[in-house]
Amino acid sequence: MYLIADWRRTHYSEEVIPEMDGQEVILMGWVHSIRALGKLAFVILRDREGTIQAVVPKQKVDEETFEIAKKLGKEDIIAIRGKVVANEKAPKGFEVIPIEIRVLNKADAPLPLDPSEKVPAEIDTRLDKRFLDIRRPKIQAIFKIRSEMLRSIRKTFADEGFVEVNTPKLVASATEGGTELFPISYFEKEAFLGQSPQLYKQMMMAGGFDKVFEIAQIFRAEEHNTRRHLNEAVSIDTEMSFVNEKDAMAMLEKVVYNCYADIEYNRPQEIELLELNWEIPEKTFDKLTYTEAIDIAISKGVEIEWGEDLSRAAERAVGDEMGGLYFITEWPTQTRPFYTLPHENDNKVCKAFDLMYKELEISSGAQRVHKYDLLVENISNMGMNPDSFETYLEAFKFGMPPHAGWGLGADRFAMVLTAQDNIRECVLFPRDRQRLTP
């Protein structure tokens, strides 16, 4: 068994092409499969980018190399130094003939999970053995697309002049006055894991940053057990000064559109591997009001009254009607947090919006209240004590500009982009009501 020593990978599997005939390469990865047929062995090496075939003919390699090849096991870690040989009959038009094989580490057998995807496994088993599960090419494809999604979003924000910020995740009280918080011991006090950076984003508007964003974890102690909820999630949050809710929606459209375009350009292999029906959306999305959404739901037999939040049945009804990406706007004020700005002509309706994909909510936002007196009134009307929000409210006394923003669920958006029906597929180590390990 060898150390890497002076060897360094020269190529990933997908970088080797037939035109490199005669060139020496060093490959490193896992043994995806091994077939020993008398005086010939076939080793499929798998790395981050794909698989590559090494052919080990006894008459063309030294005895030690051939014996090492024959004794390889699935998922052993190996390094191969060899020559590329063009061969039209080979799977990719070439094969690699090893000069030397180094076994860097052995894998125990039997494997608790088959990374080759030949043996199916339930999602709980896969999540228990996630380190093996993410070796599967299709699982890696999900996370490569997710990575490109986040890279694209950061680039769009940078191009638009946003400042990236990091807000506290240990907080003294609830952001929105709810009780769905995880309490923790904080020295002699009680604290909570943050459920949203909302109040801090708004305070940054008072600080004069104009446009900020954050990509970070949020925590919600909701006792859901569904395919679309987690208790720890990644949220993409933004806030902008001197804008209204329509400007915030336009920015969200730009972020989402750019994600689709960047993924199509930079991750075509992953799109193909996942067999995605990929289509870049229009630059502006369809929009309907909450009232119109309620009318659609009622017309499809859903029992719901104006002023209620949309039930799952209502979301399904509207999603079936709309399809794709669309906004629901002009929500009842009573369904939204205290910092949401009511319409000036009808305070029963507020300047809030949700971005939906079919029946799935992926983003929520609004124009915010920027007047101190109205904010205090809203907090009181919702049965909360303004004194509990003293440090937040202070930012509104000394020059708070009009502002708007939104939060986009990274995990849910990744679900949409990769066409997964369970949010856990898009999170490396998900945290839900039952799962706290690995």
Swiss-Prot record:
InterPro entries: Aa-tRNA-synt_II, aa-tRNA-synth_II, aa-tRNA-synth_II/BPL/LPL, Asp-tRNA_synthase_2, Asp/Asn-tRNA-synth_IIb, NA-bd_OB-fold, NA-bd_OB_tRNA. Its cofactor is Mg(2+). ATP binds at residues 220-222, 228-230, 361, 409-412. Mg(2+) 2 binds at residues 361, 364. L-aspartate binds at residues 176, 220, 364, 368. Homodimer. This is Aspartate--tRNA(Asp/Asn) ligase. It comes from Methanococcus maripaludis (strain C7 / ATCC BAA-1331). The lineage of its organism: Archaea, Methanobacteriati, Methanobacteriota, Methanomada group, Methanococci.
